[in-house]
Amino acid sequence: MDDNKKKALAAALGQIEKQFGKGSIMKLGDNRTMDVETVSTGSLSLDIALGAGGLPMGRIVEIFGPESSGKTTLTLELIAAAQREGKTCAFIDAEHALDPVYAKKLGVNIDELLVSQPDTGEQALEICDALARSGAVDVMVIDSVAALTPKAEIEGEMGDSHMGLQARMLSQAMRKLTGNLKQSNCMAIFINQIRMKIGVMFGNPETTTGGNALKFYASVRLDIRRTGAVKDGDEVVGNETRIKVVKNKIAAPFKQAETQIMYGQGFNREGELIDLGVKHKLVDKAGAWYSYNGDKIGQGKANASKFMRENTEVAAELDKKLREMLLTPAEEKPETDAAPEIEENEEF
């Protein structure tokens, strides 16, 4: 590209970012476009796929997928991680299905978690807006968009038609919430369900509930799917899960994370550490044996994961190394010594 085109492109990009905000346009290969405060999702693989080490503060996030795919588990893991950092969290339980026993198993401090079970969609969104304007809440989870029922629908008869009522309600809420969330640096996570569009012959017939407003206002959209079962002998003890970043305004999108969600435990963090460690040559694998720093840590992935679970300092050290390797922007990484150039007249 010649200099004039480079200058024109730089001016155009500058104008776009000035008009629409940072992150509205980027090169696909960029690791991240700016330093955004993030909260870990509880899954190292997903933090790396997001490109910034977690989900962004002050933004709207949408998590969608089929039933029993791990949507609520992911948000509870994130709440637990946020609480460990001293953040205040709220859970708007529109589905009236939050299990405090399960939340506690995942590490959530249920004594400090704010919970609301609103009667109508308008009430739920007003509570969200009030919490955002207070500036005292850091993370809000709304479970789920499909359960945000407009007041007119609740007060009406079963067969009444309420075309587009929920979509209009959500569209208005997005316009109000976005600015308040940014000013108070509060993250709002909307869990959404999948529906099928009727009569779609070509392309993906799947869509999410509540109209298009949430898709536009969300800075990050995560598609979470169950891909298989984790078995201990014949007993199913968890789900193999794939999470795809379908929209990302803080880093390059379309990356995927593969993880395991164990029943009653949440993410299999130790298994992720082993897999990523082997992939990036921080953990050695010879046959079925895994070694770290020259010491054997277990035969088979299950035993290596058990070692990491019992030796939290080793797990924390490996986690830190992986985050530094995979999440540090290229310009911040220390320069490695260049390979010596071979002179043309040098004999081999």
Swiss-Prot record:
Annotated residues for binding of ATP: G65, P66, E67, S68, S69, G70, K71, T72
Molecular-function GO terms, alphabetical: ATP binding; ATP hydrolysis activity; ATP-dependent DNA damage sensor activity; damaged DNA binding; single-stranded DNA binding
Compartments, record wording: Cytoplasm
Record keyword DNA-binding present: yes
UniProt xrefs under SMART domains: AAA
SUPFAM superfamilies: P-loop containing nucleoside triphosphate hydrolases (SSF52540), RecA protein, C-terminal domain (SSF54752)
Assigned keywords, A-Z: ATP-binding, Cytoplasm, DNA damage, DNA recombination, DNA repair, DNA-binding, Nucleotide-binding, SOS response
Skewed-composition ranges (Basic and acidic residues): 326-336
Protein function: Can catalyze the hydrolysis of ATP in the presence of single-stranded DNA, the ATP-dependent uptake of single-stranded DNA by duplex DNA, and the ATP-dependent hybridization of homologous single-stranded DNAs. It interacts with LexA causing its activation and leading to its autocatalytic cleavage.
PANTHER family: MITOCHONDRIAL DNA REPAIR PROTEIN RECA HOMOLOG-RELATED, RECA
Family: Belongs to the RecA family.
NCBIfam families: tigrfam_recA (TIGR02012)
Name of protein: Protein RecA
Source organism per UniProt: Aliivibrio fischeri (strain ATCC 700601 / ES114)
Taxonomy of the source species: Bacteria, Pseudomonadati, Pseudomonadota, Gammaproteobacteria, Vibrionales
